Amino acid sequence: FLVLLIGIVIGFGIYFFIDSVNAVSHVFIYWAFFVINTSLTYSYAKHSTLLTANQQYSVVRKIQGGGKILIIALQILLLVTTHNFLLYLLVETIGVIVQYFIFKNIINNDIHFKVVPQSISDDEKTTLKNELKIKIKNMFFHKIGGVLVLNTDYLLVSRFLNLSYVTIYGSYMMVFQVVTVLMSSFVNAITASVGNFLINQNDDEVTSIAKQFNTVFIALATFISLNMYFLVNDFITSWIGEKFILGNGIVILMLVNVFISVIRIPCDIFKNATGFFGDVYYPLLEGVVNLFFSALLAFYIGLPGIIIGTIISNVLITLIAKPLYLYGKMFGRFNALKKYLSFVLKPLIFSFVIFAVFYFTREQIIFFKVSNWFDFISKLTIVSLVSMIIVFAVFYADANFRSFVKRILRVVF
């Protein structure tokens, strides 16, 4: 109910904040459906959380992932056949309600979630409730900060530019957020396992696994950023047309944020696994810093300024403040900076060397012109293979990367 109420209030705020919203007919009906759909997802949040905590995340992904695929397929079909956006939103509503009943049925019929009376004192109950309240409050602040960072850019683009820029910017962000969704699924899937691993390990073993995770995700961020740089404009052109592409300079700025969103994942994994959510004000600070610098720079240089503002908040909070807080809790405050640098410095140097090599050879790669989807797939194959080989070859010189690869091979084979 609280989410629904906040959404309605924000809707009225947007009406007065963004002038071009008035040009869209039935805009408040559309907004109401979006808010209702979002609030309904909280109806089964406790069920999906219980399954995830019980290391049944694969069940959650099957329901949510399968539901999403089916919903999107029906939405595309309705848009093509009826051109009715209200029906598009109604499908989302029905899908969320169906998922709620599926989750509820699983929880009610799973013996692991049956309430069994246990001998626990009132003091212990009070302690558990207080700890749970604190962790929920801390998590709430983290989520609010994330929403501020991810969504203020759209509002600022609408305010300082216009809705046509929102369409162009949103098209790129839709592509980039595929990476975020995939990474989030991976984080949720392995967090419980990492938490179990950390319980029985000493500092040296924890340090070793932290180095491996950071090295691998920096390598992955390098690979993703390279492919996005050489392919995203071709994809947008093939998808919705050449008039919707952005300049290479703006694309590079956006990819800096994509790079940061991937290399931050080890920190998120260890934070979720250890439960160190005490840095409750960092996410809010991140949102405020992002809003301030993005609005200030947008006034002078437009869209690049908005993206640079997000980069500034990402660097200050995501890459500096949050990791230092987490590793201070894990290894001691005075060891935090030293540990953090030992995790990221060497792989970042490898990454920048690879970026430099591709930058000076970019003309040869960009020269591959794309005029249809077959050309795009061909270019995708070539760029992906070349970048994968180079990234793997360079990072394989790092012992932590080799250790992680061997660990994966042992699990697979």
Positions of the model-derived regions?
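Structural signal for membrane-spanning alpha-helices in multi-pass inner-membrane proteins
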Residues: 7-15, 75, 79, 103, ...
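Helix-terminus/linker motif at the lipid-water interface of multi-pass membrane proteins
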Residues: 15-19, 77-82, 140-141, 147-178, ...
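Interhelical loop/hinge segments that connect adjacent transmembrane helices in multipass membrane
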Residues: 86-89, 101-150, 193, 201-208, ...
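Alpha-helical transmembrane segments of multi-pass membrane transport and lipid-handling proteins
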Residues: 1-20, 33, 77-80, 101, ...
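Membrane-proximal transmembrane or re-entrant/amphipathic helices at the cytosolic face
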Residues: 331-332, 356-413
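Short runs within selected transmembrane alpha-helices of multi-pass transporters and secretion channels
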Residues: 33-52, 63-75, 88-104, 142, ...
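Interfacial/gating helices of multi-pass transporter permease domains
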Residues: 85-90, 127-135, 157-177, 205-208, ...
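Helix-loop junctions and terminal segments of transmembrane helices
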Residues: 52-53, 111-115, 176-214, 268-273
